[in-house]
Amino acid sequence: MSCRRVFFNYRALSLGRRCQRSSLRLSLGLIVLFCVLSPLRSFGAEADPKFKPGEELLDAGRIAQAEEFAAKVLKEEPKSPAALDFDARVKFYQGRYAEALAIVDRALAIDSSNQRRQALKLFSQLTLDVHKSLKPFESAHFVLFADEKRDGILVPYALDTLEKTYQTTGAELGFFPKEKVRVEIAPDATSFNAISTLSLRDIEETGAVGICKFNKLMIISPRALSFGYRWLDSLSHEYQHYAIVSLSNNQAPIWLHEGMARFYETRWRKPAPAKDAAEDYLTPANQTLLVHALEKNQFVGFKKMEPSLIYLETPEQVQLAYAEAASAVDFINQSKGRDGVRELLATLNDKATPEAIEKVYGMSFDNFESKWKGFLKSKGLKEIEGSRVRKLKVKKDQREDEEVVELKEIQSAVARNRTYLADQLFAKGRAAAAANEYQRALQASPRSPVILYKLGRIMVETNRPDDALPLFQQALEIDPDNVNIYVQLGRAEHAKKNFKEARAALEEAIQINPFNPLIYRLLGDAYAALGDQEKARAARTTLERLSASRN
């Protein structure tokens, strides 16, 4: 999700959840007032021309200059509620939440009737409440805040990915921020809603699991979602937004924001990317969506992506928009390479997008769109049968949620019913009978990654890893973001003593949902067999930590 537009989503302040936060000590009427207000551009006082330069500095991530601006206006009008509001926002953007709250209280003591000011107090309090459970962890260029007890195992992977992203993004875009970048991992959906303003609907319907906003990167813990999600790529994705805001002075359009973020989000995995690494954005589902868009000439279009992709109507539209935007960045890269991208971002500082495109690439924006579509057609994209846009699900009861979600992903009713029966047989220890039912289900839906994975799991359970491997490989060709497939693939390779391949599969699983203890039991063996005793010890330590947390 983009950080260019800084909106406060009042709808996200769910009445029920807010009422549960007794520490806020707010009246029911005040909470209702906040929930019915329409989205506004910023917190604080009503729009005042004198604060516009400061607002622009904040939105462009120029926090030090915004702080100087706040000091200047406060010196001129030390008792101005509007000046205090702006100073509070600066403190908030610096992560100084308690100070922001105290300053807002001072402004409210002077004028308590301003609704935006009341909302800023509420949001500052919510953020401060969440932050009380988070602990800071630092690396060379980042300060990461996470719940150590629940999400501590994420920290080393997150910081390693962020540092790799810092280097790969710097190499591509020439962006090397000197100040450490603030990152926050929300431990659950309620906390994520509180600090990000993204709602449960935004998570489950549009896949909004991360956001770059308020001068920081925020994601939800993969532990909070059934099956997790590509959380490390999401951290990298949000950092791309952070870079784009700075390099374009917050002037990049949403399609360029989201296109670049999607295009570059996997570069951290490949510091020296292979020739085809640029096409990592073409997941099976995204490629299929683009094929359909080309066939029907039904694109989301760059204009409809404004002001944010979360306002599109369906998950399919959101993912098509990402695919369109990323493919446009692919086209841009192939036109003039990284130098062209850097020049475009710099040109956007003082030119509108159409003029910037014309200056850098020598064509009108209409011509650019036309050539981009021609570029797409020339790629010869093919529909990947069985691929579907994955819908995220906030976890309630892990076992029940996963079983229900998996069954819903099977399109054929016949295959779904047979799979359900096979699941029941497997749960009762009747592996052979379950395998027969999974095979019957596969006859009705031969390209279902869920059924392929479940049948492969039975093969591993019955000591037939050679039969399991092709099933897992076929499933990954359709659904490369399914954590369960990687875990079972790692298990099969481990059974065959293919420890290098097992390590690769299990490390991929960590990138999606690192909370399965089996990952670390198998990884400990794989690392030890490959002679990496330090990583073997680390895997065993993580296993012990996860096991202890479940007792």
Give the location of each predicted region.
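Helix-start (N-cap) detector for alpha-helical repeat units in TPR-like alpha-solenoids
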Residues: 46-48, 81-82, 115, 415, ...
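Structural marker of alpha-solenoid helical repeat scaffolds
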Residues: 76, 110, 444, 478, ...
